[in-house]
Curated annotation (Swiss-Prot):
It catalyses: aldehydo-D-ribose 5-phosphate + D-glyceraldehyde 3-phosphate + L-glutamine = pyridoxal 5'-phosphate + L-glutamate + phosphate + 3 H2O + H(+); L-glutamine + H2O = L-glutamate + NH4(+). NCBIfam families: PLP_synth_Pdx2. This is Pyridoxal 5'-phosphate synthase subunit PdxT. It holds the Pfam family SNO. InterPro entries: Class_I_gatase-like, PdxT/SNO, PdxT/SNO_CS. The keyword Lyase applies. It comes from the Bacteria. Keywords: Glutamine amidotransferase, Hydrolase, Lyase, Pyridoxal phosphate. It comes from Nocardia farcinica (strain IFM 10152). The keyword Hydrolase applies.
Amino acid sequence: MSAPAAEPQAAPSRPTIGVLALQGDVREHLAALRACGAEPVLVRRVGELEAVDGLVLPGGESTAISKLLQVFDLLDPLRARLRDGMPAFGSCAGMILLASEVLDTRPDAQHLSGIDMTVRRNAFGRQVDSFETDLDFAGLDDGPVRAVFIRAPWVERAGDGVQVLATVPDGPSRGRIVAVRQGNVLATSFHPEVTGDLRVHRMFVDIVRAAGDRAGNVHTPDVQPT
């Protein structure tokens, strides 16, 4: 008697992930998310924010993005979605925006308190102090992550519920925290979207999928990725 045929494996869900498109390196994040099997969309309006399963806050200029969040009436709705458990990923300026406390910023700058952490803006110095290094990143296989730091922040305090994923391995900034996660929210000081290494984005897409599976409401578009 032949063995019963194996049940076909269900295709992974294709979540709709927004990229906050007010300022910064939006296009690179869109491409990385698409390559990881997500459906990336631009987010500039409240209605667009409400329709996504997760959100990327890209690198750019944190105080400019902070102002634009207020101009576009996105600040409070975004805080509310984060409180409700929406997954989010912030790189560089996005890390600053996700912090609960920001040092060396403008007194009128706003932040989202998505992660219980204190972040120092421009901690590594000016544009001329930008650099690259290899990082051991917790939860990622296949060797170190090549990290590009451009006027980057670092984390000076990580709260009790915050998982430290990566620190600077050497040099004058050795031991500084540059990647963290708290629940569904992920943040990096560096720009994974510019190196072609998709592992950090895959980690975030997996976070979004898992959150959607628990809630039973992942948006899976009918269109196929291009």
